[in-house]
Swiss-Prot record:
An example Gene Ontology molecular-function term: transcription cis-regulatory region binding
Keywords annotated in UniProt: Cytoplasm, DNA-binding, Repeat, Transcription, Transcription regulation
Gene3D superfamilies: Transcriptional regulator MraZ domain
Family membership: Belongs to the MraZ family.
A GO-annotated cellular component: cytoplasm
Protein species of origin: Spiroplasma kunkelii
Name assigned to this protein: Transcriptional regulator MraZ
Biological processes, Gene Ontology terms: negative regulation of DNA-templated transcription initiation
Gene behind this protein: mraZ
Main location group: cytoplasm
Keyword Signal on entry: no
SpoVT-AbrB domain span: 6-49, 78-121
Length: 143
């Protein structure tokens, strides 16, 4: 089942974030993998999707400087955690800093993973991102 929707939540003083119960259903074994994402966000995956993702990252190749850099950046800033009894996950201070996450967080479902965005960073990203029609046109041209 795809992860969908947008939710606003608040990061507490201990760096914990409540994940909506509807989204937590995708994390049946409770293992949560958190990593630096693209475009200024933090990615959250269940174990099955994490294994698929790390396989893709590894396939970028260790033979090139770019492949090694991508692997190092993603893997060195990743963390494995679990949900606490209140449905919260802990976001490391390293990831909070890299993604400029302060207090107000936007949680979006992005098909196979969640993305965590600082509210202000998300608003700037959405404002600057291509409109859906433009993105669809560019997508069609690449097919």
């Amino acid at each position: 089942m795809a992860l969908l929707g947008t939710y606003n939540h608040t990061l507490d003083d201990k760096g914990r974030l409540t994940i909506p119960s509807k989204m937590r259903e995708q994390f049946k074994d409770d293992k949560v993998f958190i990593s630096l994402g693209f475009d200024g966000c933090v990615d959250v995956r269940n174990e099955a999707e994490w294994l698929k993702w790390t396989e893709k990252v590894a396939s970028t190749g260790q033979a090139t400087a770019e492949g090694r850099a991508l692997t190092r950046k993603i893997m060195s800033m990743s963390d494995e955690t679990t949900f606490d009894n209140a449905g919260r996950i802990k976001i490391s201070s390293i990831l909070q800093n890299k993604a400029n996450i302060t207090k107000d967080v936007v949680i979006i479902g992005n098909n196979d993973h969640l993305e965590l965005w600082d509210l202000k960073v998300w608003e700037v990203y959405i404002e600057q991102a291509p409109g859906i029609e433009e993105a669809a046109k560019n997508f069609e041209e690449k097919i």
